[in-house]
Amino acid sequence: MEQITKPHCGARLDRLPDCRWHSSMFAIVAFGLLVCWSNAVGGLILAQLKALGWTDNSTTATFSAITTAGMFLGALVGGIIGDKTGRRNAFILYEAIHIASMVVGAFSPNMDFLIACRFVMGVGLGALLVTLFAGFTEYMPGRNRGTWSSRVSFIGNWSYPLCSLIAMGLTPLISAEWNWRVQLLIPAILSLIATALAWRYFPESPRW
């Protein structure tokens, strides 16, 4: 009786030469990492909130700590949910959570509401980072997976200087009341573009 040979997707992916498809996956993930800078912008918007009298030492510490707590939780559950739903679905889900919390947070009426939104942002961001790296490395061949991961991390780390430059440009142009709100809306809009690209071009991981 003839045996049916099961496909070995991982081995086939590893045998693929570097090609345009790998570059496309790199571009989508790198852009997604670059623009999800809700964490990077935290200190910048705190400066504006302090000028408005929204925050003191206690609320500043809470604002920062609650974001980190959310990221811890997101990192913990993000991979688990991604294992059950798939990398692509998890990518889009966590982007949606992250974007929605940034938009809602941008229209916060007070500091307590904003802090609550920051927790949700942290959850979405923590889960998103886990899923992006997990999905990306599953596409890349084993022979140079570390190289591809270094490249995508390099692009993602530019989010910190980029959002700082944007904040510098905004400060003389708009009031503090709108400055911090716009600084949350910009990454939300850019992340929406990243989500649309993922929806259109990001396939499910064959390894999953």
Residue ranges and their predicted role:
Residues 1-208:
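Transmembrane-helix signature of 12-pass secondary carriers
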